[in-house]
Regions:
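A juxtamembrane structural motif centered on a specific transmembrane helix
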Residues: 3-16, 139-143, 148, 154, ...
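Alpha-helical transmembrane segments of multi-pass inner-membrane proteins
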Residues: 11-14, 18-37, 51-68, 76-108, ...
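Membrane-water interface of transmembrane alpha-helices in multipass transporters/channels
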Residues: 42, 234, 328, 348-353
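Interfacial loop-to-helix junctions that mark the boundaries of transmembrane helices
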Residues: 42-52, 204-207
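Interfacial juxtamembrane loops and adjacent helix segments
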Residues: 106-109, 259-302
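A membrane-periplasm/extracellular boundary helix in multi-pass inner-membrane enzymes
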Residues: 165-180, 184-251, 259, 268, ...
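Membrane-interface segments at or immediately adjacent to transmembrane helices
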Residues: 241-251, 390-421
Length: 421
């Protein structure tokens, strides 16, 4: 009787894991959905629409999973990890096909974009998956006797990691390279217990350690200089964007300029800056009208103010601390990767990427807590409802159709289409 009860509990646990996996995979896989030709490439309305729909799938699956698995340990962090590794493998394979000309990219200027419309966010997504693969591979490598399931996971993590390492250099995203390097070194350092080794070495070989730190610092400066010169115009453009963003923050540091107010605030600040005449020739050459700050921290401060940015950073820090205490090393590595990438790119402006980051933070916090999972389910339900209700996909489709009619000279039909909007 006891054995039968245990078997029933195991069956329910496995069923709950499968259902949860379906829900997580449904919402996170939106990032690999191909944007239809009826709206412009890079428009986020289609992705938001499907995030709203898949949020319903995730909520239903998660609640059903909780009903099936009331007493057993939650597998949410592990499920998020392996779903992301699988999606990383799909994206990396997609990129390899584009490199060899077997698949078309989503941008006329770049051969490599994956399912994204630009190689920058695509590379950042792969950089986020890299520490997850590294952690799982190192973790499974330490086991001398692996089951066939663990053996499959071992080769899957290794294969995806190697694919990512093959594709990342071709993306030419310095931000993604730094994100992958920092998060990868952190994950490997945790596994190799570098903190303990450095503490002991610092006590025994103090002078040698100081010399090593100085040399390491010089090497980092040289690497930074090389990366800067690799695409100097792009780097100078971002420096100007950050400078103008800081000026925009100074105009309204407490409450910001409102949601989606970055473009207008940036435009005004840049106009005033150039009107003063205190600009360099390089800044004049690289100035433009960006949609994003290419620094998520500055973007949040511009739109919502410095206090809100401080609260966001506190929430992220709490989630990261919980992840460390729960020993979710790979997931914490993914969080580090996104945080580093966000210093010089715009991952949170892509809804699917942002949703993935929310799941990483949730996987850090949830651990064994069903209450935390319920709270996260509620958050995703509200976010999904917002995406679905306030979606502009139909309007974007009609606008794009009218624009095409205008371009071919069908002005009356285009006029009628624009009037509907």
């Amino acid at each position: 009787m006891k054995l039968k009860l245990e078997l029933m509990q195991m069956t329910k646990k496995n069923m709950a894991d499968v259902v949860t996996c379906i829900g997580v995979a449904a919402i996170l896989s939106v990032i690999v959905f191909t944007i239809p030709n009826e709206i412009p490439i890079g428009e986020m309305a289609y992705q938001k629409l499907w995030l709203g729909r898949m949020a319903v799938v995730f909520v239903v699956c998660s609640l059903l999973s909780l009903c099936l698995n009331r007493k057993q340990y939650l597998s949410f962090p592990a499920i998020v990890t392996w779903v992301l590794i699988a999606l990383g493998g799909i994206e990396a394979a997609w990129g390899m096909r584009q490199i060899y000309g077997l698949a078309v990219s989503n941008h006329s200027l770049y051969a490599l974009t994956g399912s994204f419309y630009n190689p920058g966010p695509y590379s950042g997504y792969l950089a986020m998956i890299f520490p997850l693969c590294l952690h799982e591979w190192l973790n499974l490598k330490e086991r001398t006797e692996r089951t066939w399931v663990e053996q499959g996971k071992y080769y899957m993590a290794l294969g995806v990691m190697l694919l990512i390492l093959c594709v990342l250099p071709a993306g030419m995203s310095r931000s993604a390279w730094m994100a992958a390097a920092v998060s990868g070194i952190w994950v490997y350092g945790i596994h190799a217990s570098w903190a303990t080794w450095l503490k002991e070495a610092g006590q025994k070989y103090k002078k040698t350690m100081i010399t090593g730190l100085v040399i390491g610092g010089l090497v980092l400066i040289m690497i930074g200089y090389v990366l800067f010169q690799l695409k100097a115009a792009s780097a100078n453009g971002r420096l100007l964007m950050w400078k103008i963003s800081c000026l925009a923050i100074a105009e309204s540091p407490v409450v910001g300029h409102g949601a989606d107010g970055f473009v207008s605030a940036y435009g005004r600040a840049q106009e005033e800056y150039f009107a003063n005449g205190e600009y360099s020739e390089t800044e004049e050459l690289v100035a433009g009208s960006p949609e994003y700050a290419f620094n998520e921290y500055l973007q949040v401060a511009v739109e919502y103010g410095i206090p809100f940015l401080f609260v966001v950073l506190l929430v992220i820090a709490f989630c990261f601390w919980r992840g460390i205490t729960e020993k979710q090393i790979g997931i914490c590595g993914g969080v580090i990767s996104v945080l580093v990438f966000a210093l010089s790119s715009y991952p949170m402006q892509i809804p699917g990427f942002a949703m993935t980051f929310y799941f990483l933070l949730a996987a850090c916090v949830i651990g064994r807590s069903k209450v935390a999972l319920l709270f996260f389910i509620l958050m995703i339900a509200l976010l999904g409802a917002y995406y679905w209700k306030n979606n502009q996909y139909k309007a974007c489709k009609e606008w794009y159709r009218s624009k095409m009619l205008y371009n071919i000279g069908a002005y009356q039909a285009a006029k009628e289409g624009y009037e509907k909007l």
